[in-house]
Amino acid sequence: KYNNNRVLVICNTVRRCQDIYNRLSEKMKLQRSDSSHKLIDDRELNMLHGKYIYADRVEKEKAILSFGKIDEDGTKDNRKGVWITSAIAEASLDVDFDILITELSDVNGLFQRMGRCYRKRSWTGEGHNCHVFDGGKKKCSGVGYNIDEGIFALSKEKLKEYFKTSPSKLK
Protein backbone atom coordinates (compact mmCIF):
# COMPACT_ATOMS: atom_id res chain seq x y z
CA LYS A 1 0.00 0.00 0.00
CA TYR A 2 2.99 2.33 0.33
CA ASN A 3 4.65 1.48 -2.99
CA ASN A 4 5.02 3.97 -5.80
CA ASN A 5 4.64 7.06 -3.65
CA ARG A 6 6.35 10.35 -3.13
CA VAL A 7 7.64 10.33 0.43
CA LEU A 8 8.67 13.40 2.42
CA VAL A 9 10.87 12.89 5.48
CA ILE A 10 11.25 15.98 7.69
CA CYS A 11 13.96 16.05 10.35
CA ASN A 12 14.43 18.62 13.08
CA THR A 13 18.13 19.17 12.37
CA VAL A 14 20.42 19.24 9.36
CA ARG A 15 22.64 16.63 11.00
CA ARG A 16 19.74 14.15 11.34
CA CYS A 17 18.67 14.94 7.77
CA GLN A 18 22.16 14.15 6.46
CA ASP A 19 22.42 11.01 8.59
CA ILE A 20 19.13 9.57 7.33
CA TYR A 21 20.00 10.50 3.75
CA ASN A 22 23.39 8.78 4.00
CA ARG A 23 21.93 5.64 5.57
CA LEU A 24 19.14 5.37 3.01
CA SER A 25 21.55 6.08 0.17
CA GLU A 26 23.78 3.22 1.31
CA LYS A 27 20.79 0.90 1.69
CA MET A 28 19.56 1.78 -1.80
CA LYS A 29 23.01 1.06 -3.27
CA LEU A 30 22.98 -2.35 -1.61
CA GLN A 31 19.48 -3.04 -2.86
CA ARG A 32 20.32 -1.92 -6.38
CA SER A 33 22.88 -4.71 -6.65
CA ASP A 34 20.29 -7.27 -5.54
CA SER A 35 18.10 -8.30 -8.49
CA SER A 36 15.11 -8.94 -6.22
CA HIS A 37 14.81 -5.20 -5.49
CA LYS A 38 14.61 -3.77 -9.00
CA LEU A 39 11.86 -1.32 -8.10
CA ILE A 40 14.28 0.77 -6.07
CA ASP A 41 16.13 1.77 -9.25
CA ASP A 42 13.42 4.06 -10.58
CA ARG A 43 12.94 5.91 -7.32
CA GLU A 44 14.61 9.20 -6.58
CA LEU A 45 16.45 10.06 -3.39
CA ASN A 46 17.09 13.73 -2.63
CA MET A 47 17.97 15.98 0.29
CA LEU A 48 17.21 19.62 1.13
CA HIS A 49 18.36 21.62 4.11
CA GLY A 50 19.34 25.18 4.94
CA LYS A 51 23.12 24.68 4.95
CA TYR A 52 23.54 24.43 1.19
CA ILE A 53 25.22 27.38 -0.48
CA TYR A 54 22.66 29.72 -2.03
CA ALA A 55 22.99 28.51 -5.64
CA ASP A 56 22.69 24.85 -4.66
CA ARG A 57 19.76 25.56 -2.36
CA VAL A 58 17.90 27.37 -5.15
CA GLU A 59 18.40 24.34 -7.42
CA LYS A 60 17.27 21.94 -4.68
CA GLU A 61 14.16 24.05 -4.02
CA LYS A 62 13.29 24.04 -7.73
CA ALA A 63 13.75 20.27 -7.79
CA ILE A 64 11.52 19.60 -4.76
CA LEU A 65 8.84 21.96 -6.11
CA SER A 66 8.87 20.08 -9.41
CA PHE A 67 8.82 16.68 -7.69
CA GLY A 68 6.02 17.62 -5.28
CA LYS A 69 3.82 19.37 -7.82
CA ILE A 70 0.16 18.46 -8.18
CA ASP A 71 -1.99 19.86 -10.97
CA GLU A 72 -5.11 21.81 -10.05
CA ASP A 73 -7.26 18.78 -10.87
CA GLY A 74 -5.29 16.67 -8.36
CA THR A 75 -3.21 14.86 -10.97
CA LYS A 76 0.39 14.01 -10.09
CA ASP A 77 3.10 12.78 -12.40
CA ASN A 78 4.54 9.28 -12.19
CA ARG A 79 7.72 10.21 -10.35
CA LYS A 80 8.30 8.47 -7.07
CA GLY A 81 10.94 8.55 -4.41
CA VAL A 82 12.03 10.15 -1.18
CA TRP A 83 12.97 13.70 -0.22
CA ILE A 84 14.73 14.02 3.12
CA THR A 85 14.64 17.56 4.45
CA SER A 86 15.22 19.65 7.50
CA ALA A 87 12.45 21.84 8.91
CA ILE A 88 12.96 24.10 5.89
CA ALA A 89 10.23 22.09 4.14
CA GLU A 90 7.54 22.74 6.74
CA ALA A 91 6.71 26.22 5.46
CA SER A 92 6.85 28.24 2.25
CA LEU A 93 7.12 25.26 -0.11
CA ASP A 94 3.97 24.50 -2.09
CA VAL A 95 4.50 20.76 -2.40
CA ASP A 96 2.10 17.84 -2.13
CA PHE A 97 3.58 14.48 -1.15
CA ASP A 98 1.81 11.15 -0.62
CA ILE A 99 3.49 10.03 2.60
CA LEU A 100 4.99 12.10 5.43
CA ILE A 101 7.48 10.73 7.94
CA THR A 102 8.52 13.35 10.47
CA GLU A 103 10.18 13.89 13.80
CA LEU A 104 7.95 15.64 16.30
CA SER A 105 9.04 19.21 16.92
CA ASP A 106 6.04 20.98 18.40
CA VAL A 107 2.36 20.94 17.50
CA ASN A 108 2.56 24.10 15.37
CA GLY A 109 5.46 22.69 13.37
CA LEU A 110 3.70 19.34 13.08
CA PHE A 111 0.61 20.95 11.55
CA GLN A 112 2.82 22.82 9.07
CA ARG A 113 4.56 19.59 8.16
CA MET A 114 1.30 17.70 7.74
CA GLY A 115 0.26 20.43 5.30
CA ARG A 116 2.89 19.11 2.85
CA CYS A 117 1.05 15.81 2.50
CA TYR A 118 -2.16 15.52 0.47
CA ARG A 119 -2.28 19.29 0.28
CA LYS A 120 -4.57 19.49 -2.75
CA ARG A 121 -6.16 16.05 -2.61
CA SER A 122 -8.20 13.94 -0.21
CA TRP A 123 -6.68 10.83 1.35
CA THR A 124 -8.61 7.81 0.08
CA GLY A 125 -6.05 5.11 0.71
CA GLU A 126 -5.83 2.50 3.41
CA GLY A 127 -3.65 2.91 6.45
CA HIS A 128 -1.96 6.10 7.49
CA ASN A 129 -0.09 8.55 5.34
CA CYS A 130 1.45 10.68 8.13
CA HIS A 131 3.89 9.07 10.53
CA VAL A 132 5.27 11.01 13.51
CA PHE A 133 8.37 9.85 15.37
CA ASP A 134 8.16 11.25 18.90
CA GLY A 135 11.54 10.01 20.10
CA GLY A 136 10.18 7.32 22.39
CA LYS A 137 12.07 7.50 25.67
CA LYS A 138 14.69 9.73 24.07
CA LYS A 139 14.29 13.22 22.67
CA CYS A 140 14.03 13.88 18.97
CA SER A 141 16.93 15.69 17.35
CA GLY A 142 17.02 19.41 18.03
CA VAL A 143 15.11 19.27 21.33
CA GLY A 144 16.90 21.57 23.75
CA TYR A 145 18.76 23.17 20.87
CA ASN A 146 16.37 24.67 18.29
CA ILE A 147 13.22 23.22 19.89
CA ASP A 148 12.22 24.22 23.40
CA GLU A 149 12.22 21.18 25.71
CA GLY A 150 9.07 22.27 27.56
CA ILE A 151 7.08 22.92 24.40
CA PHE A 152 8.26 19.61 22.92
CA ALA A 153 7.26 17.68 26.06
CA LEU A 154 3.85 19.36 26.17
CA SER A 155 3.27 18.71 22.46
CA LYS A 156 4.23 15.05 22.86
CA GLU A 157 2.00 14.64 25.92
CA LYS A 158 -1.04 16.28 24.30
CA LEU A 159 -0.71 14.29 21.08
CA LYS A 160 -0.50 11.03 22.99
CA GLU A 161 -3.50 12.07 25.08
CA TYR A 162 -5.50 12.98 21.99
CA PHE A 163 -4.84 9.73 20.14
CA LYS A 164 -5.33 7.65 23.28
CA THR A 165 -8.85 9.04 23.74
CA SER A 166 -9.66 9.29 20.02
CA PRO A 167 -8.11 6.28 18.26
CA SER A 168 -10.50 6.66 15.33
CA LYS A 169 -8.88 10.03 14.56
CA LEU A 170 -5.77 8.19 13.43
CA LYS A 171 -7.28 7.71 9.99
Model-derived features: where do they sit?
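Flexible glycine/serine/alanine-rich "lid" or loop that lines and gates the nucleotide-sugar donor pocket
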Residues: 94
